[in-house]
Structure formats: C-alpha cells, structure tokens
Amino acid sequence: MSTEALTLNNVTVDLRQQRILDGIHLDVSPGSFTCLLGPSGCGKTTLLRAIAGFTPLSQGDIRLGARSITHLPPEKRHTAMVFQSYALWPHMSVGDNLGYPLKLRGVPRAERKRRIAAMLERLELGGFESRAVTQLSGGQRQRIALGRALIIDPPLLLLDEPLSNLDAAIRRSLRSELRRLQKSLGITTIMVTHDQEEALQMADQIVLMRAGKVIQVAAPQTLYQQPADLGVARFLGVDNTVTRHEQDPTVGSRAATFGFRTRDARINEPLRPATLTRKGRVTECVYTGDGYQISLDTNEAELFATANSPIALGTFAVLQVPESALIPFGPDDRHLPPLDRHEDIA
Amino acid sequence: MTTSSSQVHSLAVPNRRLPRISLGMLLVLPALTAILLLYALPLARSLVTAFRDSSGAWTTDHVVRAFSLYGRDMLFSVGVVSVSLALIAAISIAISGYLVLGATPWAVRLLRWLYRWPLFIPFVVTGQIARSFLATNGMMNNVLVETGLMASSSAQSFLDWRGLVLTFAWKQVPFVTLLLAGAMAAVDRSHIEAARNAGANRLRCLFEIVLPQAAPSLWVGLILSLVAMLSVLSVPMMLISGNPTMMTAMMAHRITYYGDYGIANALGLFSYALTAVTAWVYLRLTLRREATA
Ligand SMILES: Nc1ncnc2c1ncn2[C@@H]1O[C@H](COP(=O)(O)OP(=O)(O)OP(=O)(O)O)[C@@H](O)[C@H]1O
Ligand SMILES: [Mg+2]
C-alpha cells in the first residue's frame, strides 16, 4: 500500500452534547510530516481518534487518497496508530505483537517470521522476538509499538505524543530516528504533541489548535515568525508584548502591539538604530545556562530580556530589541501580514 | 537512635516475642478451628468411611460397589456437568464480550442490567421454575404450540439431561459472567483499540485480545460452577425422576433409604476427585502463565 494524502473537510465532533472539534479543515499531502500542536484539552487526541475511527463525527468528511473513510469501522481504515501508552498486548511476545497485524491480513507464518525479524533489525532490536513485552524498557516499548504500526506499510501513520513518556535524552535521539524512518518510508504521518520544540524540529507542517478549532496551519518557520495571533504567539514562546510607541521602529506602522521573544531582547548594550527600546527597573535576575534572564518592570508591563552578565536588582536598565525580531499585531490581536511592512517602508 | 534502643529492648527482654506469636495464634485460631472442625475433619471422616466396612475393617468394597451400581450415574454426571460448563462458558463469553465491545450503548446498558437477575434466585426456586417451564405441558411447549411453531403432538418433556443443563446454565451464567465481564472491563481500552486499528474485527478482538487477558477469571468461574453443580441436590431431585441421574441424588438416596454411608461416601470421593483434578489443571495453567509472563 502506498502512502496517501489525507483530507479533512468540516470535521465536527460532539461528545456528551459538548462540541469538542468544530469544523476542522485540513489538507495533508502524501509523504509529509504534520504535527498537531496545541494546549492541553484542545482536542488533538480527539482529532487523531476521529481519523483512526474511534470517535464518530457529527458532521464532515475524512478522505484518505480518493476514498472517503468517514463511515468505515477502525479495522477497515488501514491507518496505523501508535498510542501514548503504547498499548502492547501483554499476553503476546514481542514477535507476536509485531506479527499480529500481518496475521490479521493472512500473511503466512514463514513470511511473517521474516518480516518480524527484518522490522526488529530496523528498530535495532534484533533477536528480541521471544521476549515478553513486559520486560522491555520504555524506549524499547516505544520502538516496538512503532514497529507494530509500520509493519503493514500503512498509508497513514498516526502518533499520539509518542515521545512524551520518555526521558529527555532518549526523546532527542528517538525524535531524529523517527523522522529518519518516516522520510525513508515516505509515509504520511500525523503526530500529536504539546511540545512546541518537538513540533518545530520534526514537522513539515504544523497545525495549531485551540479549543477545538484549527487556528493556523503553516510551516515551522512561518509559524514561528508569523504566529496568527497573540495567543498563538504566546504558545510559541513570545513572552513579551508591548503597546506601540511613537518613537518605535516604523515596521508595521499599523501595529497596535509588538511581541518579541526573551532571547531577542538584550539589556544595556550600545544603542543601535531601528530598535525598540524600553527602560525599566530590574526585579529579577536568573541564571539560565546561556546567560541571565532579566525581569524588567516598565511602566506598562513586566518584560523579560537576556543579559550576558548578572545585573543588580533595583537598578534601571535599557532593553533593546532589533526591528527584525519584532512581531507586529493589529488592534484585534491578529498578526499583521508581512505585506504591510513593505507598504510601511515605501 | 530508635533502632539501637529497640535492639537493646529486644535483647534485654528476649521473651517479649512470645506473647506476640500467641496473639497472632489467637487471631488465626477461630478460623483455623472452624476449618478443622467443619471442613477438614468431616472430609477426612467421609474419606475414611468410604474405605471401612460395618465392622470397621479396611475395604475397597464400597468403592467397587459404587462404581458397579452407579457407574452410569457417574458418567451421566460428568456428561451433564461438561455440557453445562461448555454452555455456561459460551454464553458468558458472548454476554461479557458484548458488554465490553458492543457498539449499541442502550443495548449494552440493558444487558448489563438484565443478566444479573438469576443470581438472586436460589437453586430450589430455579428448579421449580425450570420444572414448570420445561415439562411436557410446561410453559415453553405451550408457547411453542400456541404460536404455531410446533404441533402439540410433538411436544416432549425436557425434564431430562437437557433440562438439567439448561437449569444449571441459567443459574450459573450470571455468576461466571459477573466475574468474566469484570475482568474484561479491566483490560486496557487501548489494547482493544490497538487491535482494531491493526485490522481486527470485534470478534477477533474478543477471542485474541480480550479473552486471553481475562481467561483466569473464566477458569475460576467455571471451577466454582463445577463445584456448585456437583453439590446441588434440589435441581436433579426436582427435574429428574428416573435413572440415570446426578450423583448427589444417588448419594441422598443411598443415605435416606439405606442409611448406607459407605457407598454414599465412595460416591462423594468421586466428586472430590473430579473437582480436585480440575483445580489442579487450573493451577498448572496459571503457574505456567505466571512463569512465562
Ligand atoms: N470521551 C469523552 N467524553 C467527553 N468529553 C471528552 C471525552 N474525551 C475527551 N473529552 C474532552 O474533549 C476535549 C479534548 O480532549 P483531547 O483528549 O482531545 O485533548 P488533547 O488536546 O489531546 O489534550 P492533551 O494535550 O492533554 O492530551 C477535552 O476538553 C476533554 O475533556
Ligand atoms: Mg491528548
């Protein structure tokens, strides 16, 4: 089975008279890696389960390639899902877990054995066939769960926070391993995560969700530099917002608010042209490893900036953000399109 | 600090451990006495009686006579119990499976509410109900004839082995289902979803994912049902008039009409053996499972 495109059209889900997903439209191109990103409870898992067939739609249509799968039971959809808890069957060995999807498809025993061995090699778990799944480490279970999903060459791979149960080091290595595997197989993949760093690193396309709605669909760079509104921006680490002043850079002259990231704001450096500056009293100074994070109390807001050396509390300091790092928002808190910049400059 | 002081304490007064043991003994004693007096002793006595003649000499006479007189009843008992267990297992699996995997919420709720009722009806009443339901002119045949599904001439009594099997199943299915459905509900939901995602339909999910994980409870339920069926007297007495019948009926017959405890106990011996073998098989199975897990 080759990889296929996924199309969601007005997908709406109600659970117990409550609207959980609200008119979701989404196009996922074949072979791409899409991340569903959003705060806890926004409906990411529900969307994934709706695609896999475990949550009925109250409206809308889901298409895989040319066929509609909206009304198919889960077992007929041929999607492959990796569960957050891995859901390995404890009464089966590692080999039987991997082989069960093949058994269901009537693959003969010898062929099954060969493909299980090949998959274990690929997962760098060669010779694990007869192990009990209860004796595996978290990272090994995760890989077996992934192998069980991939062994049938599914047209669509669905991952629900596959890395969130693992510790930071394994997580980083599995992240690139997973991405490499996905690229080499060219399989259309949708991954749920609430870790923005994970999404930015892995995805071709990020779907940002909030309260059951899709807010923005964009490539990682676009999402990072041009978040659709202030809420999205805050979710993507834009911790600071200031109202625009007269003397501020001309970029986005229609902007009511500027957002910027803490690491783009410097403290007490020689003033450069075309920068946004604010003055305030230092209220906190925290070592972060790369430098110091300074909290600055200005008249209008508390702002955060980065300094190379510690700064005494209570002193006054000047915060400076280069024009290129400013993200302009209109009076309605929506991002002003980059087109505006050109107009303003002209 | 605390450890050293307690050590000193126990060194200084070594006999302080003694009262503690006797306190433990005191707590266990009532249960132990009850088991010894009410269970172990009668069991031993009945075993011994099975191998003693009236003068008190050892003999295998009772056992041999029990087999020659009641061999057919023993086979009948084994047959009825086996068929009943198979039926109980099949229905319990079907009901629990539907409770866990059913797709129609209201039907699942209704079934969950309905299936337990027979649990609260004692065996005697069950026997009475079955009698009036299964007899030649009982309710079942009446309904079949009234609705025109069966000619009145072909109405026959179900008060034989079939009646026994149906009655036992009716009484024991809710109990086994209660155990099995509980165990199935405890199976992680994501295990079922992972299987369906892998391409398993509901039926395969039931037999290949859910049932294997819940099987220990099914075995426990079936063994307890076996014991119940081998020990109940009222149902075979009420449903079956002639021969062959269940061993309990024969044991009661032997005692009430002949005062012959020897043969009655020899028959009892057979019941013990049957349950013991089943329990042993079950233990072997669970131990092997635990060793591989
Ligand atoms: N079976 C259900 N019945 C009713 N409401 C549900 C059910 N499952 C989820 N919800 C609700 O739907 C909303 C979305 O849940 P969902 O699990 O999709 O969130 P999520 O984005 O995956 O969150 P997280 O990041 O915490 O996993 C939540 O408000 C939740 O309370
Ligand atoms: Mg979730």
Model-derived regions: residue spans:
Chain B
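Short, Lys/Arg-rich, polar N-terminal cytosolic tail immediately upstream
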Residues: M1-R20
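Membrane-water interface segments at the C-terminal ends of transmembrane alpha-helices
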Residues: R20-R52, L69-S153, L159-A185, Q213, ...
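Short glycine/proline-centered loop/turn elements that form peptide/ligand docking sites
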Residues: V187-H191, E290-A291
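Short cytosolic juxtamembrane segments of multi-pass membrane proteins
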Residues: L285-A293
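Short alpha-helical segment that forms part of, or immediately flanks, the ligand-binding pocket
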Residues: Y115, I192-E193
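Glycine-rich helix-loop "coupling/hinge" segments at transmembrane-helix boundaries
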Residues: R52-G56, L233-Y261
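Glycine/proline-centered hinge or cleavage motifs at structural transition points of membrane proteins
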Residues: A198-A200, P212
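A short amphipathic helical element positioned immediately N-terminal to and/or at the very start
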Residues: W58-F67
